[in-house]
Amino acid sequence: MDIDQYMTDLGRRARQASRAMARASTAAKNAALAAVAQGIERDAALLKEANARDVARAREKGHDAAFIDRLTLSDKALKTMVEGLRQVAALADPIGEISNLKYRPSGIQVGQMRVPLGVIGIIYESRPNVTIDAAALCLKSGNATILRGGSEALECNAALAKLIGEGLEKAGLPQEAVQVVATSDRAAVGKLITMTEYVDVIVPRGGKSLIERLMNEARVPMIKHLDGICHVYVDDRADLAKALTVCDNAKTHRYGTCNTMETLLVARGIAAEVLPPLGKLYRDKQVELRVDAAARAVLADAGVGPLVDATEEDWRTEYLAPVLAIKVVENLDAAIDHINTYSSQHTDAIVTEDHDRAMRFLREVDSASVMVNASTRFADGFEFGLGAEIGISNDKLHARGPVGLEGLTSLKYVVLGHGEGRQ
């Protein structure tokens, strides 16, 4: 296969399809989404069989537990896919919406219209759910997309792509609006991220090595996040029950996700109260604890162990595993300073009953999602009511946080006049 020519052909077809998608009716887009949802429900067993073969091959290659977790298509994951499709269909269509329309002294009216970005390239590794999430959001927002999933999910992604194509065809939309790259050759990625004439934006979803490669090589703009180094700070005015619930869920709900807590910060004034029960909870769930000296003293005194001494590198590490760094800090000032020094600007949370401290945390922590008395695991498009997300961005330009429909659009100026000329 000539990868260069193959990718160029995909890009050309996507660009052509993007023009049809930009003018597609809301009814047609929703019909396509409904058809894909019905197809997933109908073919759930076939999808799970294809996924099981992908998972078996991944295990044979020696991939770790976090990787297998992301790759596995469970009944719950299939249900979430279907719910996401229907939730996206139920969302208001932003395309064509005109806002901020104002009269100018010259007599013209100036406003802004929401329009699709055009062609979006999605590069991801071992998450078959991304195939559906990305297709749904790109479709509803009037974009065409080129999906390049990881080679480990090739069989499942091919089955999902077939369902998406059928859904588009039933709705009278071009099947080329959603194209899946049918090769695992890494050269396809290299070509996709440089096709500025056909691709308007790249959204990478994968490990750090993938993101770093794309940051170095891409010529097409990206919506991305590099790491998910998420923190929970337990303030000395926290409710103990809330702290236990939030800290347990933020770490142990799922280990292999970018919104999982990796560092726990505890105010010195509440450390003796909150660390022992948390330490025992984590020990019972076999979470390795990497602790500073102050946390070690409290936990050891409570009989919690084994404990590993934390290093500077631990504050900068996204484990994606049952490992947690714990640090005792003096107060809110120290917590905010630590977070803004080591955070990846993804998601950070505070547990406190003090309203002023909570508001200060929200204002001063420089992350895409900042939470009060809630688990970092809520940093998710589905949980935020976006229907699904195409990814999470910790950049500060264009889109930030979970990226849903509006993140895949832009605003253009529109001017309405009555024959006016500029004086």
From Swiss-Prot:
Principal EC category: oxidoreductase
UniProt name for this protein: Gamma-glutamyl phosphate reductase
Listed GO biological process terms: L-proline biosynthetic process
CDD domains: ALDH_F18-19_ProA-GPR (cd07079)
Signal peptide: none
Catalytic activity: L-glutamate 5-semialdehyde + phosphate + NADP(+) = L-glutamyl 5-phosphate + NADPH + H(+)
UniProt keyword Ubl conjugation present: no
GO cellular component labels: cytoplasm
Enzyme Commission code(s) on record: 1.2.1.41
GO molecular function: glutamate-5-semialdehyde dehydrogenase activity; NADP binding
Pathway: Amino-acid biosynthesis; L-proline biosynthesis; L-glutamate 5-semialdehyde from L-glutamate: step 2/2
UniProt keyword list: Amino-acid biosynthesis, Cytoplasm, NADP, Oxidoreductase, Proline biosynthesis
NCBIfam families: PRK00197.1, proA
Localization, UniProt: Cytoplasm
Claim: DNA damage is one of the keywords in the record: no
Family: Belongs to the gamma-glutamyl phosphate reductase family.
Main function: Catalyzes the NADPH-dependent reduction of L-glutamate 5-phosphate into L-glutamate 5-semialdehyde and phosphate. The product spontaneously undergoes cyclization to form 1-pyrroline-5-carboxylate.
